């Protein structure tokens, strides 16, 4: 498929379609002999399914005020590895979920998982909430520490790491959902935020939101709908679905963890989810904003992470290699800053520039030479996080 880069609007302000990105542009911005212009695609309705922090989805939410009645959205970074383990250690179907260590040692929160798959393979991962306060925290290095816990290490010793990946996660849940229908379009999946964070699962919810959109629009177009309308029927169908019920029952999970902390929040959620089945007669709200949670570096304790041992823990470069991503060198860097002065003039002295650490693939670096510090982007290391 082709990635959409811009929105196309009708004269009445409704979404008319999208424009795909140009291809064949050199790193200097010149057209190469392989140049292909973007295509303007029109549709009666456009379904936006870009995933977490989709650039068009963010634009639509802001333009149409879709989140004015919602609490602020919350995000996390999920890091995952696939391992081949010895047959005698394989427990097909075993599922382990965890919270607390190692993140709680640095005042952060999140969760972990370990799934025994087929063919002696294990998938493991760590989700780091992006409301942590210590700017020296590194999600990648926290994952490497996580694997040294005895309950995890017992399965990995003698095994081999096969793959690595990372992804941003929209995890605000039910309370942070924006209005998902707009004139000429619909938001689905993580573009809206349909992840069930209590279960650390979002594939089934994203699929269901897309199915509701397809059924709603098919019926409308079959009946002669000319397009461009704000389909309130989608919202109605969403409210009548099991998706709405599931997300509503998990509505207190994230706010409880953020407001009460890992242990008290965990106790509350155990009662809410397992005893009351998400049917408590009140709703917790979390009005905090993730990006405002960092303390200034001078007030935070620096974190020294152990070196990779090459057995259980690894460095970023060898991990990026296992993602099997590759980018054409001679193309524009799309990781552009609105204000290039912020990393060195604001973030570095105030926050020790956390972008050096919170991007798992190590895209941003600040090397120093005789001329001073330089904020450097290693585009070849980029994997599609959308942080």
Place the predicted regions along the sequence by residue.
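Glycine-rich, charged/polar anion/phosphate-binding loops
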Residues: 63, 99, 108-112, 169-176, ...
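Active-site-proximal substrate-binding core of FAD-dependent oxidoreductases
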Residues: 193-199, 205, 211, 215-262, ...
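Mid-to-C-terminal "cap/lid" subdomains and adjacent gly/pro-rich loops that border
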Residues: 77, 81-104, 113-116, 120-126, ...
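Predominantly flavin-linked oxidoreductase catalytic cores and closely associated redox partners
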Residues: 2-154, 194, 212, 216
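Short FAD-binding loop at a beta-strand-to-alpha-helix junction that anchors the flavin cofactor
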Residues: 118-120, 179-198, 357-365
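Flavin (FAD/FMN) cofactor-binding core of flavoprotein oxidoreductases
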Residues: 154-175
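Alpha-helix capping and helix-loop boundary segments enriched in small/acidic/polar residues
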Residues: 70, 134-137, 176-179, 197-205, ...
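Ferredoxin-type iron-sulfur electron-transfer modules and their immediate structural context
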Residues: 241-375, 386
